[in-house]
From Swiss-Prot:
Zn(2+) 1 binds at residues 46, 68, 175. The modification N-acetylalanine is found at residue 1. Zn(2+) 2 binds at residues 98, 101, 104, 112. Its cofactor is Zn(2+). This is Alcohol dehydrogenase 1. PROSITE patterns: ADH_ZINC. It comes from Pelophylax perezi. Binds 2 Zn(2+) ions per subunit. NAD(+) binds at residues 200-205, 224, 229, 293-295, 370. It catalyses: a primary alcohol + NAD(+) = an aldehyde + NADH + H(+); a secondary alcohol + NAD(+) = a ketone + NADH + H(+). SMART domains: PKS_ER.
Amino acid sequence: ATAGKVIKCKAAVCWGPKQPLSIEEIEVAPPKRHEVRVKIVATGICRSDDHVISGALSDMKFPVILGHEAAGVVESVGEGVTKFKPGDKVIPLFVPQCGECRCCKNPESNLCYKNDIGKYDGVLLDKTSRFTCKGKSIHNFISTSTFTEYTVLDEIAVAKIHEDAPLEKVCLIGCGFSTGYGSAVNTGKVKPGSTCAVFGLGGVGLSVIIGCKVAGASRIIGVDLNSDKFTTAKECGATECINPKDYNIPIHEVLAKMTDDGVDYAFEVIGNTTVMTSALSSSHFGCGKTVIVGLAPSSAVMSFDPLLILTGRILTGAVFGGWKSKDDVPKLVRDYLNKKFDFDPLITHYMPFEKINEGFELLRNGKSIRTILTF
């Protein structure tokens, strides 16, 4: 009944940095050619959304509807769309997969050229947005915008998933879980019997731990300044956890003593350039690999002694855990349904959508891992 019509619905609009999100009635235009309109059922609160609210990502265009980790149901499709129909369960993809660009054609890469990460144009592929509020056009956020009851997505930025998938759980596959898990199994390529250190034990860091465990690592050391996070980290597979505040020597020296000169794999899951250098320094000089997972503020610069690399360390990273989004998201959902991993330790809070600002406060105060908002 709503197909082809403008839908009025609730959304959380970010009118500018350093202010709470505002619940507004917005208009969502119908999907154009090769677009899909989706009713969002569940959406997670991710640290990257908060980087926009705090002003850390300075290139962002306002006003904007944030949110990029979600699951929902197709409401209607635009002209030329053949792979989706109303009622399909889907996950929006902040890294699209066009299938035609250099990255999509390269099996080693997943960062489709049609993404909006770092550019932050805040529009769909046709250079316009489908959102309006109080007569103003509202920007999109990295191809997704999920803090709204309805969103419009380019069809290259949607994955159809199994009809049995519980949307309030698998929404994590839209960002946090896949980013962390893939950083271990794809980007790091963690080997059985190896030693890993994970810096930052939020939702993504815990997902790195799950990935290290699935990959067969024998030691997984969690590192965080908040010792309250250690219980959940161990539940996810960490074999031990350390707090840098408990030592009067640099953390890479602590790890060197624990691991016969350094870990095989180090993961930075905070987005802090000082910690990135610590992670690199904590990896073994001749054969250690460091994976950057965290998103640093716009102007941040990482500095380190090139000798760290010259001796044989590898420094790498990936967006969205290296997954080719359209291909791999449905497989990850099937793996979840087949109980290859469990999301329950990652989800600490469920909240109604209207309480979105409270959800962000929990994240900022270190009181939550993942908060899932439901409509």
